[in-house]
């Protein structure tokens, strides 16, 4: 299905392209802290921490900031205690929405995320109310200018990837969650430069939005959720046709 879906192409580059560098740094620091807390400070033995540190370096984060975040996670330095929490619910036109957050105050975060849902005509539901509509996948983004789809297909499938999809500017390589790091390494060993590699939630089916007002409400809600300080990632199952996106983007 053509059009603009929340998990396609451009959204995956948001963290590295976001002009609000302070917000990007905050999110990465929280991820480093949690990863170090859960899996220890050794990058070789902690894939999640290794990925977070790679993201930090790609965003030009100073090495001292990275080191301090790791030390806070392992308890060597004092700092805020962050928890991971996921909210599920429905947005405009009954689209399914999942919001992953990291927070040092669950009550505050819940109140603020709920307000975004309700202000756009949506509602937060109970755990599991929409997540069954999605599958967790590893996703690797590769610039289309660096390799052809055919060449990438051969390398990626041999490396253990599940599927490949080419968007307008990037190739998307999908993997099982546990295979993400392995496939990424295998691609890079073959000389394939990856732009990002992350875990994501892919909807089983998409809801096509053909009404301009509904599309506008959805995009405003997505932007507000994306921009919230505690938000780590937002997933949804909407698909807005390109012609509608062009109209509401003017």
UniProtKB/Swiss-Prot annotation:
GO CC list: cytosol
Chain coiled-coil ranges: none
A GO biological process held by the record: regulation of DNA-templated transcription
Localization terms from the record: Cytoplasm
Protein name: Probable transcriptional regulatory protein Emin_1151
Organism: Elusimicrobium minutum (strain Pei191)
Similarity section: Belongs to the TACO1 family.
Keyword Nucleotide-binding: no
Keyword annotations: Cytoplasm, DNA-binding, Transcription, Transcription regulation
InterPro entries, per database record: Integrase-like_N (IPR017856), TACO1_YebC-like_2nd/3rd_dom (IPR048300), TACO1_YebC_N (IPR049083), Transcrip_reg_TACO1-like (IPR002876), Transcrip_reg_TACO1-like_dom3 (IPR026564), YebC-like (IPR029072)
Chief site of localization: cytoplasm
One term of GO molecular function: DNA binding
Entry keyword annotation includes Ligase: no
